[in-house]
């Protein structure tokens, strides 16, 4: 009951409140689904099948506003992570299938100036950084000396921005979230173009 009252219910209320501004201020193609199971709120249970740590529950709240064509966490999305000492916003795509990953890499090769321009935008470069897994060697079929090889080696295309725990209690947290995601609008639009889905 404590989980229901202090975590799930307020999380679902936040998701519901995000629906209209998400569509009107960011993109009509990303969805906020306020459901206990199968919606934007990620499950509290950990997958312990291959983990040494068998603790059954996560210590964070994860919320993903994914693209309408996406079925799971591997779809492009706007993400919110709430955990004591580690609260952050995320934007992009996590562990895309190999075919989608190849599309993104090819798009960067074909449109390098746009990619570099987005990453150097002041409101993006000052507050956000790209995180995630990368290959040790250059991906097959791509020039190892390409000027953007660091980005071409990425396995995740996630932009990440931390914020303090106290921000969670802001009365305007919905606006705070939307304004942060807006800083990544061009970044998300670029990834959607690479994947040939609407933004």
Q: Which residues make up each language-model segment?
A:
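Short, hydrophobic/aromatic alpha-helical segments in well-folded domains
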Residues: 2, 29, 90, 103-104, ...
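A short, surface-exposed loop/turn module that caps and links secondary-structure elements
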Residues: 28-57, 126-140
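A residue-level signal for beta-strand positions that form part of recognition/binding surfaces
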Residues: 41, 60, 156
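Short, highly charged low-complexity linear segments
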Residues: 78-81, 121-125
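Active-site acidic/histidine clusters and adjacent loop/turn architecture
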Residues: 1-44
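Aromatic- and glycine-enriched beta-alpha-beta binding-site module
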Residues: 45-109
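Long, solvent-exposed, polar/charged low-complexity segments
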Residues: 1, 10-23, 108, 113, ...
């Amino acid at each position: 009951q404590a989980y229901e009252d202090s975590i799930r219910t307020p999380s679902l209320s936040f998701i519901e409140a995000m629906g209209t501004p998400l569509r009107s201020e960011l993109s009509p193609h990303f969805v906020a689904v306020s459901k206990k199971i199968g919606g934007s709120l990620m499950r509290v249970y950990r997958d312990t099948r291959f983990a040494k740590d068998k603790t059954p529950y996560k210590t964070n709240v994860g919320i993903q506003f994914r693209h309408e064509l996406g079925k799971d966490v591997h779809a492009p999305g706007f993400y919110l992570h709430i955990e004591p000492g580690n609260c952050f916003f995320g934007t992009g795509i996590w562990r895309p299938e190999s075919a989608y990953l190849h599309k993104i890499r090819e798009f960067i090769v074909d449109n390098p100036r746009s990619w570099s321009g987005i990453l150097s935008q002041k409101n993006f470069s000052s507050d956000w950084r790209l995180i995630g897994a990368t290959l040790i060697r250059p991906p097959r079929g791509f020039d190892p000396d390409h000027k953007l090889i660091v980005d071409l080696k990425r396995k995740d295309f996630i932009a990440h921005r931390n914020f303090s725990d106290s921000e969670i209690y802001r009365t305007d947290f919905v606006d705070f979230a939307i304004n942060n995601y807006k800083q990544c609008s061009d970044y998300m639009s670029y990834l959607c173009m690479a994947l040939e889905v609407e933004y």
